[in-house]
Every structure is written in C-alpha cells, then in structure tokens.
Amino acid sequence: GLSASRKLCELGICTVALLTGAHYEYHHHAPDFLNAGGTQAELDGLERAIANNPASGVHEEAFDQMSKWVVQYAAQMTLNVKVDSDLFKHLHGRLSNTEIVELTTAIAAYNMVARLLVALEITPEEK
C-alpha cells in the first residue's frame, strides 16, 4: 500500500484530469477520490479551483490546507512542470520523503496517462 494518503493522491490525479481535459481519467478517478474519503463538496470545489488558476493558489473553503497545497502542487506540475520551492517546503514539512515521492509519482504518471487519453480522444464509456 501507499504511505501517502490515497485521498491526497486521488485529489492530485483529479486535478490533472480536469486541467488536461482528460474526461475519461476524471470519470474513473472522481469515484476513487470519494471512496478514499473525499467529499462531493471537495470535487465541486476542485472544479471551481480549476477555473481560477490553481497553480497560483487555491482558496476553496471545501479544502483543508494540505488539500489546497496538493491541488496547487498538481497544477504547477501539470501546467509549469517546475514547482515553487516554498510550496514544496510546505508539503515536505507535512509529508515524509516517501509520501512526497508517492504523491509526485501519482501526479506525474497521470499527466502521462492524461496526455495519451486526450491525444487518442478516449472518452468515458456510456453508462
């Protein structure tokens, strides 16, 4: 199992999916976020945050501070590649080295998946 919170990893993945327009990825990972302890209010907040330049900061009341940092971190990794050193210090102050690597790996891996899904125009299955 992961050392990093599954909820935080899924939040990072959902952030990547929304930022890249990978609807298939979001369709499959939003339920995983909820199953990991996330709330619909947080998903709604994430959708609002995505519309308001989350790489520069997240101000949604639905999120605790750690979740705000995770969304901002995923946004910076996705949009800028480079991450602000102060943001990294905030995360590293609360997460172990292993947790930081797991969170970063999840965000990076799903950036690759998102780009594949969007380029190939893979969309969610019909229900």
How would you describe each model-predicted region?
Residues 1-127:
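Hydrophobic alpha-helical segments
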